């Protein structure tokens, strides 16, 4: 660099491209902002053709080229021309360097910046230099940062191909109004670290993952458990219903052996069948068994083979599982009730409000797309009035509780049907045997606080199979569940 006098030529627009290079041994003067640079032809040729080689090929070598750009950014460009790798510090420097690399038409530097090993962003006022290698796994690749970069580069390519005058359409430095603390946790998890996270923090991180489109990491944070069922010889996945991804839900078609066998298990929980009465335990007498020593109560048969005669829904967690597992979904809502019909010996689950909306949102598509029998959940919908006399939509679905680990009012209940059949059970419940004509009958209604279910289909019908449930029967029992602050 020097202060030698010479003709100063100011260029602020793009020059025509020429493949000619400059003499390697010549020194050329370039003033960027308030700083004068003396640069050899060999250095300018290192990323040619470019703005400088085009200019000095048409002007005297003693001409001083003046460009009104940032000298600080040009120092990084100058070091790149000298062969050094650019060390970019933050999102502002990255954006400015990319803008000037385009302005000076430096093809190698533009390519290097596009393929740089880091994303630069600012989360809630804190700058982050994020290694792209953290997003190598399927489901994390097409994330927020990759999408923004791709859109920006595509706009620049359109601008270059159309040879439009002026500056390229660059996005401003990346600023995201999210929590930097949560983002640090995300980077730690992507890097393979194990963090002790509370339920509340996990829920917050899941929301952050959705914002940044880190789909695989989101699924890794979702609470789920894979268990092996030795009775069915199948693996099962336990997961909250609101964490289920619709695209991972499938219905496994039954084999001809299972679909053709309309045994007690098939009809065990269907409305209006004798098999239902036996399987649910509503109707058992000594004459049923006779004197046959080999007689096995119907409830036992159901426990072993009910699922084999229903197409149970399966679930494969996106980006995590390679195969589907039998789905056991958990309902946290208390907007669910089990209705035991004493007269018709039926069991139904009544889902209302958010629980009904959630159930329909997760399963309506897969049930309608069933290749054997399309099932429309609207056929299970009824309009009922709540305690404030407001009309709301309910989903009322046939259910089976014969294999359920059931808790009623805080106590284990081994035989719920003995309570229903008791002469003291004279409560009035909704008769759900015909949803088009609703009446009330004697029975028992239990409100669910927490429950786990399987969903099965067969011949165009659906059934909810209770796996585990905690219930309460009335206001006093509900009050017992309320904890002090």
Curated annotation (Swiss-Prot):
This is BTB/POZ domain-containing protein YLR108C. Its main location: nucleus. SMART domains: BTB. Present with 189 molecules/cell in log phase SD medium. CDD domains: BTB_POZ_KCTD-like. Residues 26-121 form the BTB domain. It comes from the Eukaryota. It comes from Saccharomyces cerevisiae (strain ATCC 204508 / S288c). SUPFAM superfamilies: POZ domain. The lineage of its organism: Eukaryota, Fungi, Dikarya, Ascomycota, Saccharomycotina.
């Amino acid at each position: 660099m020097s202060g030698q006098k010479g003709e100063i030529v100011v260029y602020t627009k793009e020059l025509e491209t020429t493949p000619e290079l400059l003499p390697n041994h010549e020194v050329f003067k370039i003033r960027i902002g308030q700083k004068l640079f003396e640069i050899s032809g060999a250095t300018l040729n290192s990323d040619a053709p470019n703005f400088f080689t085009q200019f000095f090929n048409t002007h005297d070598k003693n001409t001083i080229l003046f460009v009104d750009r940032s000298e600080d950014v040009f120092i990084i460009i100058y070091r790149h021309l000298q062969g050094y790798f650019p060390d970019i510090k933050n999102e502002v420097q990255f954006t400015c360097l990319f803008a000037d690399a385009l302005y000076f038409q430096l093809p190698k530097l533009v390519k290097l910046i596009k393929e740089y090993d880091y994303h630069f962003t600012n989360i809630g006022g804190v700058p982050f230099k994020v290694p792209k290698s953290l997003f190598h796994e399927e489901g994390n690749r097409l994330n927020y940062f990759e999408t923004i970069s791709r859109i920006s580069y595509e706009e620049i390519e359109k601008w270059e191909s159309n040879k439009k005058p002026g500056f390229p359409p660059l996005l401003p430095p990346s600023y995201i109004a999210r929590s930097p603390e949560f983002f640090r946790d995300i980077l730690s998890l992507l890097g393979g670290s194990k963090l002790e996270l509370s339920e509340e923090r996990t829920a917050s991180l899941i929301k952050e993952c959705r914002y940044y489109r880190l789909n695989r990491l989101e699924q890794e944070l979702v609470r789920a458990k894979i268990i092996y069922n030795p009775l069915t010889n199948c693996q099962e996945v336990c997961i909250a219903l609101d964490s289920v991804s619709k695209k991972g839900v499938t219905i496994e078609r039954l084999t001809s052996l299972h679909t053709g066998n309309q045994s007690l298990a098939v009809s065990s929980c269907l409305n209006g069948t004798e098999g239902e009465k036996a399987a649910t335990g509503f109707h058992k007498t000594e004459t049923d068994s006779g004197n046959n020593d080999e007689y096995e109560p119907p409830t036992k048969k159901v426990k072993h083979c009910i699922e084999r005669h229903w197409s149970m829904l399966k679930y494969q967690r996106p980006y995590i599982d390679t195969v589907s597992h039998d789905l056991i979904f958990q309902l946290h809502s208390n907007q669910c009730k089990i209705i035991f019909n004493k007269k018709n010996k039926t069991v139904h689950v009544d889902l209302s409000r958010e629980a009904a909306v959630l159930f329909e949102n997760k399963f309506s598509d897969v049930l309608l797309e069933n290749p054997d029998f399309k099932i429309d959940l609207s056929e299970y919908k009824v309009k009922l009035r709540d305690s404030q006399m407001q009309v709301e939509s309910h989903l009322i679905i046939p259910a089976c509780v014969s294999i359920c680990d059931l808790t009623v009012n805080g106590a284990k209940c081994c035989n719920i049907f003995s309570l229903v059949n008791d002469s003291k059970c004279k409560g009035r419940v909704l008769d759900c045997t015909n949803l088009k004509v609703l009446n009330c009958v004697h029975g028992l209604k239990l409100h669910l606080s927490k429950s786990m279910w399987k969903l099965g289909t067969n011949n165009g019908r659906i059934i909810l199979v209770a796996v585990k449930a905690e219930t309460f029967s009335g206001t006093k029992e509900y009050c017992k569940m309320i904890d002090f602050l």
